[in-house]
Regions:
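Hydrophobic alpha-helical transmembrane segments of multi-pass inner-membrane transport and secretion
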Residues: 20-47, 56-92, 112-126, 206, ...
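Short helix-loop junctions at transmembrane helix boundaries
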Residues: 41-54, 124-156, 213-230, 617-680
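Juxtamembrane interface at the cytosolic side of transmembrane helices
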Residues: 78, 86, 178, 224, ...
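Hydrophobic alpha-helical segments
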Residues: 114-258
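Basic-flanked hydrophobic alpha-helices used for secretion and membrane insertion
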Residues: 315-568
Length: 684
């Protein structure tokens, strides 16, 4: 019986004696389980599922569970490598004392079982306790009524238990792979084996500089939001690769340069730190690069999602400037004439009046749209032979009658034949003439007129709004030409947007039960659609606000959750980096003390090393964030939020708060390093 429990006791004893190493790892595992359970539970929550906007949030949270699962696998593998490295000498001693590789494998198996049981049990217990708090926070972000029913998601419990069972099994198999084929002597000497600096430092450093410069140039040169969306992930990959190259090879190059500077290098506070850094920078640089990337991810996520959440009402108002928006479209023979538009207007107002409301702040206009590829000031409508790269350049062209634009905006603009006004959205139009498919050319009298908000802001593609006289005549000419040239038929649309004095729950179909104006208008327009052969749509700001809040609130909540995970991951990496380097430097500082180096000199040397490398990730993350700002701004435009001042504010506050947290971590981990290299050496 004692033999059966021997391996379990050895595993537990080894973990307990190395608690300085294992405790952060166990906490990290439990934290990952906790976060995964909460996100999985919320993504399938019945409470959120029955709320307006809850569906959008659920989709976002499901994506978050995938991110957590993948990150947990990578991060736990990374941190476990520190544990194995520190335990290799212990395993070598077991081997020398008569234990075979199979016996050591049993110890590792029991360590895995104990780790899985402790962390999964603790994480799930905390998850069940804190789940309701997270759900209440999510409900609060969605701005919907709160429910206090306590629920336990059995499916989420099983999913978390299964996922982390697989992760710990893979970690165990990797540990056994590392153990297999290594001799006892190699295990005993593992802690004294130095890390060789990477070869061809100058080549790798130059590659990192080129990659980073290319990513930065890409970030500041892209003008269209859709192009920013498509190129964003390519830029992210380039920045990640460049960061690793610069921290691994660039750090070695920096250390070699400092060693050549005799006035700097041959000082007590610099000599030990620089010489030790030069021979361990491959692993040290990778850790610092990981911290830099995690810090950048946190800053980008929290600044952008905070900006979205704070500015969500601005986004709603930009997309829906009025309470209701009615659209009638689909006539290919001719746009609605004034008499037909008046008939529709009276029908809509009569429906609103019969429902008990009144219309105000009315905006009504007609428009017709085409799309094509810009070639200077010419928009080419025939896209045959266009490449995949051209998809980001496709531009929507909306033509509006001058009289409708004036009525909708309250202006009194005038135009002569052949003249137009242009408003550019999500693109630039610096030209004095506008040509449509090489045939119709207009002189642009003003390129900066205020665009009509509403449906135009919903397009994610570059858009030009063109205001022109003699609208009906031009549309007929355009349709005749396009029909003959491409076989196309145009779609004309009539918009009627207005405010109403009805309460929000009677404006749109919010809860699916209350009679509302949106359903009444759809009923009236269904008859119009049948009689006239046109398409119709009715959109309510009140009903769509819930979807906006669901999407933006979900992104904000996910940004907070992932930021917490990434911050703790960065802290764990920094802690293990300082811990492992502290143990490796302990003997070096012990020798330096014996030849006359004082505790004050040791402290100065430690501060020199920490200040040299510890703040590099934060500084470079700040630089990454500055160059990512144009990308972030353009991506937020795709969410109908174009508020540069708000984004600057949230970005600055996010960086300031993160910098304070980073400084606190620097202080704590620096003290850990100092205690290992200074106080432990004194005991000898």
């Amino acid at each position: 019986m004692r033999e059966k429990t021997l391996y379990a006791r050895l595993a537990w004893t080894g973990m307990r004696k190395n608690r300085r190493l294992y405790l952060p790892y166990l906490l990290s595992c439990a934290g990952m389980v906790l976060m995964f359970y909460i996100l999985t539970g919320l993504s399938g929550s019945e409470v959120l599922g029955h709320m307006s906007g809850g569906g959008s949030s659920a989709i976002i949270l499901r994506l978050g569970t995938v991110v957590i699962a993948v990150f947990a696998l990578i991060f736990l593998f990374y941190t476990h490598s520190f544990l194995i490295r520190r335990r290799e000498r212990e395993f070598g001693l077991y081997n020398v004392l008569g234990m075979g590789k199979g016996n050591i494998a049993r110890i590792l198996l029991w360590e895995t079982v104990i780790t899985y049981g402790l962390t999964t049990g603790t994480g799930l217990l905390l998850g069940v306790v804190l789940y309701k708090l997270a759900e209440l926070g999510m409900v609060r972000l969605l701005q919907v009524p709160v429910t206090y029913t306590l629920t336990v998601s059995v499916s989420s419990l099983l999913a978390a238990a299964a996922l982390f069972a697989v992760i710990h099994t893979l970690i165990l198999l990797n540990s056994l792979r590392q153990l297999h084929g290594v001799s006892a002597v190699a295990l005993l000497r593992s802690e004294s084996v130095g890390e060789k600096p990477p070869r061809a430092q100058w080549v790798l450093t130059a590659a990192g500089v080129v990659l980073l410069g290319a990513a930065y140039a890409l970030a500041v040169s892209i003008k269209e939001p859709l192009a920013a969306l498509l190129w964003f992930f390519a830029a992210v990959i380039m920045v990640i690769l460049a960061t690793y190259l610069l921290f691994i090879s660039g750090s070695v190059t920096l250390c070699r340069g400092l060693q050549r500077n005799k006035k700097y290098y041959y000082r007590p506070q610099h000599f030990v730190s620089v010489s030790s850094m030069a021979y361990r920078m491959k692993r040290n640089g990778a850790g610092l690069a990981s911290v830099c990337i995690l810090a950048t991810m946190v800053l980008v996520m929290i600044s952008s999602t905070t900006c979205l959440y704070v500015g969500q009402e601005d986004a709603v108002n930009a997309r829906y400037p009025r309470d209701m928006d009615v659209a009638v479209y689909g006539r290919s023979d001719h746009p609605l004439d004034e008499a037909e538009a008046e008939q529709l207007r009276q029908g809509v107002e009569s429906t609103v009046f019969n429902f008990g409301g009144q219309t105000s702040n009315v905006a009504t206009y007609r428009e017709i749209s085409v799309s094509g590829l810009p070639d200077g000031g010419d928009l080419r409508l025939g896209n045959a032979g266009a490449s995949a790269a051209d998809s980001t350049r496709v531009t929507q062209l909306h033509f509006l009658p001058l009289e409708d634009y004036n009525a909708a905006t309250g202006q009194s603009l005038t135009l002569n034949d052949g003249q137009v006004y242009v408003a550019a959205l999500r693109t630039d139009f610096p030209y004095d003439t506008l040509t449509v498919d090489g045939e119709w050319t207009f002189r642009v009298m003003d390129r900066d007129i205020p665009p009509l908000s509403g449906p135009f802001t919903a397009d994610i593609t570059p858009t030009l709004m063109v205001v022109m006289p003699h609208f009906t005549q031009f549309v007929q000419e355009l349709e005749d030409g396009l029909s003959e040239k491409y076989g196309w038929y145009l779609t004309a649309t009539w918009h009627y947007a207005f405010d109403t004095d009805l309460p929000e729950n009677q404006q749109g179909n919010i809860d699916g039960t209350t009679p509302n104006l949106e359903d009444a208008l759809n009923g009236y327009l269904a008859g119009v659609s049948s009689d006239w052969g046109v398409g119709v749509s009715v959109e309510s700001k009140a009903a769509n606000r819930a979807d906006f809040y669901g999407t933006y609130g979900g992104l904000f909540f996910l940004g907070i959750m992932l930021s917490i995970v990434f911050i703790f991951a960065a802290v764990a990496i920094l802690y293990y980096k300082q811990l492992s380097e502290g143990y490796e430097d302990q003997s070096r500082f012990d020798i330096m003390q014996k030849v006359g180096m004082t505790k004050v000199d040791i402290r100065r040397s430690i501060n020199s090393q920490l200040l040299t490398v510890f703040y590099l990730p934060l500084v470079l993350a700040g630089v990454h964030l500055c160059f990512a700002f144009p990308f972030i701004h353009k991506l937020l435009i795709l969410f109908n939020l174009d508020n540069r001042g708000l984004l600057i504010g949230t970005t600055a506050v996010s960086f300031a708060v993160f910098a304070v947290l980073y400084a606190i971590v620097y202080k704590l981990t620096g003290n850990t390093y100092y205690r290992i290299v200074a106080e432990d050496t004194e005991k000898e």
